[in-house]
Amino acid sequence: MSEIQRYLQLEISQQQNFLYPLIFQEYIYAFAHDRSFSKSILLENTGYENKFSLLIVKRLITRMYQQNPFIIFPNDSTQNQFFGHNKNFYSPLISEGFAVIVEIPFFIPLIPSLERKKTKIVKSKNLRSIHSIFPFLEDSFSHLNFVLDILISHSVHAEILVQTLRYWVKDASSLHLIRFLLNEYCNWNSFFILKKGSFCFSKRNQRLFLFLYNSHVWEYESIFFFLRNQSSHLESTYSRVLLERISLYGKIEYFVNVFGKVKDFQVNLWLVKDPCMHYVRYQRKSILASRGTSIFITKWKCFLVTFWQWHFSLWFHPRRIYINQLSKTLLEIWGYLSSVQINPSVVRSQILENSFLITNAIKKLDMLVPIIPLIASLANTKFCNVLGHPISKPIRADLSDSHIIGRFGRICRNLSHYHSGSSKKKSLYRIKYILRLSCARTLARKHKSTVRTFLKKSGSKLLEEFLMSEEDVLFLTFPKALSIFGVVYKSRIWYLDILCISDLVNYK
């Protein structure tokens, strides 16, 4: 770690020319291995000296440049003929180390700004929570009218990824190496899946995948930072830091060509400038909401498609960008169905002998549980059928009843915890019912009896932990909340401790 810190303290001119030698430094791969191990409790720590050896890295890169396809190892039929080693072994090796190296130039522009401002980055776990975005949506989206629902494609050509990194990584040798790796990964079908000349990311090599994908997406998202600074009178520190790039300002000069050749740049900028524009990206989707009219949001759609296509080599089919009215559509956001509902409120006002009825329309963001996708997910993991009827889940015979109940209970509590912000709890109750009855049928199947006979024989105490409702959990946490529970439980609750969504497939 100290070697990397000393490297970050070099001058920018030196940093741009010494990325490639870092590939041969053993501490880079040890650092990458330690970071990967610290994030996963399922990995077996066998020691990085057996996997991330400097000698292995040098031999790997030497064979890459020799390009001898006639190397055959009779002892290992699964070895790749080009590299002479197992692709499952070298794929994470070179990708994890290279991801750490190419991330270095992205941190360089942040260092001078933080030193000038003498600011410290405050790490807050609450801001990392998935639920932290929902209060923002409740405060902002209720005042907006239209939204652009953009479906981001994972299919990216390898050369586009290299060109994206070219603005940040000035080392030509590193760019040639990553271009070579992408082409070879295509042949391996381990890092990318080739589809009609483009690359689709697979689930392997997550670190390098996230880096390439986020850098590519941020490249065309950078236009929103510029427009936000032009529309807002408040200074954005991080936007100003990220905009210190020559490539972006060069592309901004072409705004005039999008809407016509007008000499006044501010006139063209006014066509797409909106102080109430909000942008949110999540998974493979991004949302651009505005308070403008339908004509304004249509101009935005045409602008984005044209600008991204001509200046970022990014093709967005117009049919992948949907214009929706918030009050008439349901948006899928992080496992919720959200829409803006208009609730009329009638107020009676009386002045002397005259009385008036005033009707006010109050907009409120409504969050619903997507019952159909959840049932489909439960059906895929064999908790129920496609119609939502609970079924028994095949399990190992050596598992105890308490272990089975604990697994079902954790899944039920996780779903209840995550979907606690739903405004209507009826769909959530149905999911709980499916899991509870599936647990009972699984235990009855294990004991070779019926559900009624098993529950009557075991008693209600057996499922007491699993059947513990949210009311009991709230009472145990806040004993004084009994009097106000009727109001609290029906309202939406956002938890700031949810960092990821548990996958039901992990149930075995």
Curated annotation (Swiss-Prot):
The keyword tRNA processing applies. One of its GO terms (biological process) is tRNA processing. Keywords: Chloroplast, mRNA processing, Plastid, RNA-binding, tRNA processing. One of its GO terms (cellular component) is chloroplast. GO terms for molecular function: RNA binding. It holds the Pfam family Intron_maturas2. Its main location: plastid. It comes from the Eukaryota. It is found in: Plastid, Chloroplast. The keyword Ion transport does not apply. Belongs to the intron maturase 2 family. MatK subfamily. PANTHER family: MATURASE K. Usually encoded in the trnK tRNA gene intron. Probably assists in splicing its own and other chloroplast group II introns. This is Maturase K. It comes from Collinsia heterophylla (Purple Chinese houses). The lineage of its organism: Eukaryota, Viridiplantae, Streptophyta, Embryophyta, Tracheophyta. The gene is matK.
